[in-house]
Amino acid sequence: MTSPTKHALLSASSAHRWLSAPPLPRLEQYFPQSTSTAAEEGTAAHALAEYKVHRALGDLKFPRPSSDYQCDEMELLTDDYSSYIMEQYVKAKKFAKDPLIKVELKLDFSQYVPEGFGTGDCVIVSDHLLHIIDFKYGKGVKVVARNNPQMKLYALGALAMFGNLYNIDEVETTIFQPRMSNISTWTIPVKELMHWANTELKEKAELAFMGKGS
């Protein structure tokens, strides 16, 4: 996921933290943001992965990024990610004549989370199904898709964008984490997702934005 130029206070990537401890984001504003080699490596991998998906989709003018972090392993694993995306796109074509695919799509979920936005690595929309795919280059912690709040927030943003254009009744979320040989997929009905958004999510997001709660 390419980092937006503006950082959301209640980011999707930190949702697991502020949903559990709503006052945390406001407290963290008092501490300077820092980066790490792992984070910089992840940014480089995401940029390379984005380039390869664009190329696979026929966008030959999309510029190839350069980074000192690029290596044989990164080349191989971003190839795997690109291949997986194309497999899912081909799969979507079996259920819809002309499915929509978007790469590094800015998603606005501020209807539920104050000033909430994020960037979806890949979004595929077909009849009745929305598929959100997130590329994780980290190898320290295995990430699962089941009830993953980051993925659910991305899904809400995509539904806000495409829900009136497609008859979507199910959301599929996938974590693609190649350095841990992890492809984790989870499916949730749109009705269930919206119930969570309008109850637990909204309540805790409002508390977190105000720096309240416990």
Which role does the model predict for each range below?
Residues 1-130:
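Metal-dependent nuclease catalytic cores that hydrolyze phosphodiester bonds in DNA/RNA
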Residues 97-212:
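Mg2+/Mn2+-dependent nuclease catalytic core
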